[in-house]
Amino acid sequence: MGLTRQLLGDQISINVGLNFGAVRTMYDLYVSGVPCDLLLLTRAQIDELDAAGCIVAGSIADVGHVKTGIAVRADTKANPDIHDAASLKTTLAGASSIYCPDMKQSTAGLHVLGMLKQLGIWDDVKNHISEHPNGATAMRMMDSSNDANSIGCTQVTEIIYTPSVRLVGLLPKEFELSTVYSIAVPKRSTEPEAAKAAIAKLCGDTNLSVRTAAGFDAT
């Protein structure tokens, strides 16, 4: 969210209306026929649409890999241990609330649900889950909760984007999640050339450091 606002909103001379949400929600909106000049989804979703003949040939570009991590409120001194599955289990089980994105529509939310079940603590923590439409909203709500013992789990881009929360670290290897996000021009775009210019700016080498700072690792 922060990356696209910064690069597409400020650095190119076109007006850009941005619509953010869980990737499955965005995918479903596109399929439903909502007007769209640029699509930023997981690589798997973009490839699916490309195979269906929905994407302008040659317009697909990878923005980067995004990993999933654990966050706390920025104003707490807490530094929970998440270095392995056992410590992560203890940390999550002891949290007063666990803030995460939509567990049906978002990449990270689906992963969190599976992780809690695999750790064997779902039944213990399910009443403490605070689920939100996307990770950025989840992080903002964690900050506004004034609960110093809360934990957030979402993609690092959404943690970095929210100044009022702090990234503790990435999920341990047993639960590592790295998702490739890609951008493309849909065939129903009414501004295909402007869309291609936006992709060139967003994914160009000159903005590699900006993407890295926003939480996107090079593909």
Give the positions of each predicted feature.
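Exported/periplasmic ABC-transporter solute-binding proteins
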Residues: 1-20, 24, 28-32, 43-66, ...
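Short acidic/histidine-rich motifs immediately flanking catalytic phosphotransfer sites
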Residues: 34-37
